[in-house]
Each structure stands twice: as C-alpha cells, then as structure tokens.
Amino acid sequence: MSAVAINHFFGLPEAIEKLILPISRSGESNNESRGRGSSNNIPIDILESPKEYIFYLDIPGISKSDIQVTVEEERTLVIKSNGKRKRDDDESEEGSKYIRLERRLAQNLVKKFRLPEDADMASVTAKYQEGVLTVVIKKLPPQPPKPKTVQIAVS
C-alpha cells in the first residue's frame, strides 16, 4: 500500500482533526493547545505488515487501567486516556520544587484513526509495556472479486 493510501486511511488533515477532536476544558481545541500537553504531541508510529496493522504510541507514566482502546462505528479506532502521570515529587522531600519541568503528558489523550476496509475489527488487541501502547489489528484475507452481470437495456 502506498504512503498516499496509508495517509488517506490513517492521517487526518489538521483542519479535519481539529473538528473531530473534542474541545478541552479551557475551550481550546487540541491543536491550539500544542506544546502544553496536547494529545497531538504524542508520538505515534503505524506499521503495516502483510498480516496486520500495528500502532505504537509513547505514553509513559500512565496507568494501564487509565487507557481505553475502542473501535467505533465507521471503522474508527479510538485511543483515550484521562489518566494523569504520577510525578516523582509526590515522594520528594518537603520544600523541594521543580526548577524545570519538560516531561508533560496530555491530560486528556484522544486519538482517532480511520481504519482501512481490510482491518479485522474483531481482532483488535492492545498491550501497554514500558510506556508504549501497542495496538495490533489483523487484516482480513483478501476477497476475490465477484463478477457482476450487467443488464443491457433495449431501446
């Protein structure tokens, strides 16, 4: 499958993604809050093999129980998390404070992907290990083309 076709199935232009993704509590869309823990900053790799599609998302520090992976109508894979990363300062000495804090994570992660026709919606599996969420979707076997008889109109 070409890169253009994969982009058609998996990638949404930012303008469309902005419409689909929910608005944050502050009223900003996820695209507008870029750089402040936006879910658009979550690195994602999508691998297509001959037998399956594999999604890799880096979301360190979130509890596995706070991550939801669902398949919605219209062949849409949805990955959500409302979890908050636990900071090391919960256990630090009283009077300690961060002087630099760059490792922020989306507070409300929502990622949606339109899946291709050959994705087997019943075979979706997910695992979360060492801060990486891996979602695997098997491919359906190719369907042989069905011949279609066309009626010829007589005029």
From Swiss-Prot:
Subunit: May form oligomeric structures.
InterPro entries hit by this protein: A-crystallin/Hsp20_dom, HSP20-like_chaperone, Small_HSP
Organism this protein belongs to: Arabidopsis thaliana (Mouse-ear cress)
Encoding gene (name): HSP17.4B
Protein known as: 17.4 kDa class III heat shock protein
Leader peptide range in chain numbering: none
Subcellular location(s) per record: Cytoplasm
Domain sHSP: residue ranges: 35-155
Family of this protein: Belongs to the small heat shock protein (HSP20) family.
Higher taxonomy: Eukaryota, Viridiplantae, Streptophyta, Embryophyta, Tracheophyta
Pfam family, one: HSP20
Keyword Cytoplasm: yes
Gene Ontology annotations of biological process type: cellular response to hypoxia
Keywords: Cytoplasm, Stress response
A cellular-component GO term for this protein: cytoplasm
